[in-house]
Amino acid sequence: MRFDVEAYRKRAKEDFEGAWHQGPEVLTPAGYQHRYPHLQYQRAREHPIFAMINALRQTYLSLGFDECANPVIIEEQDVYRQFGPEAMAVLDRVFYLGGLPRPNVGIARGQLDQINELLGREMTAETEEHLRETLHAYKKSTIDGDDLTHELAVVLETDDARVVHILDSVFPEFRSLCPESSRSTLRSHMTSGWFMTLGSIWERTPLPIKLFSVDRCFRREQAEGPTRLMSYHSASCVIAGEDVTLEDGKAVSEALLSAFGYTDFRFQPDEKRSKYYMPDTQTEVYARHPVHDWVEVATFGMYSPSALAEYGIGVPVMNLGLGVERLAMIHYHADDVRQLTHPQFFPRVLTDRELAAGITLREEPASVEGRHLALAVEAVARAHATEPGPCSFLAWEGTLFGRQVRVSVEEPEENSKLLGPACANEIFVYQGSVLGVPDADKWQTVRTDGVSTGITYLGAAAAMAAARIEEAARCGQGTTVQVKMAKLPSDINLQIREYAMRSITDTKKKIDVRGPVFLTVRSVIPDNL
């Protein structure tokens, strides 16, 4: 909070040591929400796949490759041009694009009568003609499908909801439509786009041409699995020029992959021989990683002159490609590409630190005075914890909401101590379980290896008492707050956030905060006495 600079300057001149010891009084007591580990300063998490994409992009750019966006939609005939006799096998793995046909909607007299009935009025001859023209325009694709409802609403002078009802009731053709496939496909290899791109620019661009693209490809797998996705990212590059050879592929592989921690490299012929590569040029790249040892990370080769000739490309072209997800799996030590790519569908087990941040208090004082009150109750109760009852100790006296309030910690019964033994317990998260434990040898492992929430039973109960005393003072009343035997988190004012509770139950861990607390806090307003 703000403080009087002149007052502290004067105080320091008069009694420096005293002023130094009084320094903490300028601090506003933090609520539990603003205490560690609940208070966190952390950067947002980036997605591992996109982090890898960005790293690959920057590496390619640093190697002098220009970035390119290749076509995603590839016509079937282009696959035949590139793969030759192999095209049929390749097309078995691609997604064809399809769509709903535009129905040829005829409007007979009976249908017009149905529309009139739904509209509650007779259409004019001019409106009927406009209706026919609109449906014909839709058939000819002059009107887009998502605009049809609005256009019909304008013609019929009604609202969109009624038009939807008319289409559903009067024109069943719209409900019985089945998708029809086109001859267009989604790109299954980045190569499909490189032929088209190079065919357009190779004679208009200084050689050698060095391009790269990191983008999405689609492959119709029988099923997705730990190492296969139907939609994946390819990090691909090409070098086109008169003197380009397979040696360029080796050099680019080393330059690109060394940026990701790979050291030694090994190149060996690929048993798969794609027809768009020259014979004996398709090469697998193995690289040694400090953690993973030798791993296959990329493939490169020289495009076949036969395939290049289909696009009028008259210079050799080296192509290198690697799967972004494959590289990310190695980098992030992942064993399932589905979980790496779509973590939201694979609930992550929270760490003890993350669980501790999700445990807070149900009730806390709202005012600064209320926070001071809670700290005072905690301090006085701890100082007199073993005093026998009946007893009462003044903990705090001050103003709340314009009213003078006096607060005491007390034990009204005989043969009982001011506090129960569990008041000193502290909440820890240990191996996914939430435990309230004392400072004793039996629980030393939990206290040493677990994560503290920074919440004690006494502190939580004192905060609840302060919050309720605050509320009572706002209404001009005193109150008595008692916490007895704790069985559930709510008994000691604990709140476990829903995400943390879900993680605890999903992993079959436990919450054990049982213990005798037996704290009584009473507030009075002297003016009411």
Swiss-Prot record:
Chain residues that bind substrate: 189-191, 234-236, 276-277, 319
**Molecular-function annotations in GO:** ATP binding; phosphoserine-tRNA(Cys) ligase activity; tRNA binding
Superkingdom of source: Archaea
What the entry lists under Gene3D superfamilies is as follows:
6.20.250.20, Bira Bifunctional Protein, Domain 2
What the entry lists under InterPro entries is as follows:
aa-tRNA-synth_II, aa-tRNA-synth_II/BPL/LPL, O-Pseryl-tRNA(Cys)_ligase, Phenylalanyl-tRNA_Synthase, SepRS_C
Q: Keywords on this record?
A: Aminoacyl-tRNA synthetase, ATP-binding, Ligase, Nucleotide-binding, Protein biosynthesis
Q: How does it assemble?
A: Homotetramer. Interacts with SepCysS.
Q: Which family does it belong to?
A: Belongs to the class-II aminoacyl-tRNA synthetase family. O-phosphoseryl-tRNA(Cys) synthetase subfamily.
**Protein name stated in the entry:** O-phosphoserine--tRNA(Cys) ligase
**Species this protein is from:** Methanosphaerula palustris (strain ATCC BAA-1556 / DSM 19958 / E1-9c)
